[in-house]
Amino acid sequence: MATAKPILYGAWISSCSHRVRIALNLKGVDYEYKAVNPRTDPDYEKINPIKYIPALVDGDFVLSDSLAIMLYLEDKYPQHPLVPKDIKTKGLDLQIANIVCSSIQPLQGYGVIGLHEGRLSPDESLEVVQRYIDKGFRAIEKLLDGCDSKYCVGDEVHLGDVCLAPQIHAAINRFQIDMTKYPILSRLHDAYMKIPAFQAALPQNQPDAPSAK
């Protein structure tokens, strides 16, 4: 009996969904993608009570939070390891991933931007988001000072790269960040855009993207 494909609930524009798509692609997992708007779809709460995306349904197991999903995938699918074996390299890689997941992305999301509605103009809201992104990018740029490897912590893609790539993409395409301030991150972005697994995961390449309709 064939095993059912895992189902990824997400949205084209979500950088959290974007990073999980990259991880699934890198590991060669055949999955089903279901687009969802967690703010308007009442049924999604049955899958994820906190109503954030993404969520992964793997048989009778449901998991939400992109970092938890990627670590689950890492354990279930050993091909193309995303977590380095060396403990210091692993520590740096996880630090980069967590800066993105904890200190940048949550502060640019709809939940936070929505708090500004009525109090700040769109331009003022954008400036707030840009400050958060710039703060995180400055930190990562310093952490990677002197980095001469192909990717964040080596010549293979790891978890930090998987988290960083969507954040840089959003910074450029949604939040008008001047990437000339971040030469290392700009170089990494160029490297990511050459990888088929990253290209396939891009927001504009998803079936729910406006460009796909």
From Swiss-Prot:
GO terms for biological process: glutathione metabolic process; L-phenylalanine catabolic process. Has a glutathione transferase activity with ethacrynic acid and nitrophenyl acetate. Has low glutathione peroxidase activity with cumene hydroperoxide. Residues 4-81 form the GST N-terminal domain. PANTHER family: GLUTATHIONE S-TRANSFERASE, MALEYLACETOACETATE ISOMERASE. It is found in: Cytoplasm. One of its GO terms (cellular component) is cytoplasm. Belongs to the GST superfamily. Zeta family. NCBIfam families: maiA. Residues 86-211 form the GST C-terminal domain. Its EC number is 2.5.1.18. Gene3D superfamilies: 1.20.1050.10, Glutaredoxin. Keywords: Cytoplasm, Transferase. It comes from the Eukaryota. PROSITE patterns: GST_CTER (PS50405), GST_NTER (PS50404). The keyword Hydrolase does not apply. This is Glutathione S-transferase. GO terms for molecular function: glutathione transferase activity; maleylacetoacetate isomerase activity. The lineage of its organism: Eukaryota, Viridiplantae, Streptophyta, Embryophyta, Tracheophyta. InterPro entries: Glutathione-S-Trfase_C-like (IPR010987), Glutathione-S-Trfase_C_sf (IPR036282), Glutathione_S-Trfase (IPR040079), Glutathione_S-Trfase_N (IPR004045), GST_Zeta (IPR005955), GST_Zeta_C (IPR034330), GST_Zeta_N (IPR034333), Thioredoxin-like_sf (IPR036249). It catalyses: RX + glutathione = an S-substituted glutathione + a halide anion + H(+).
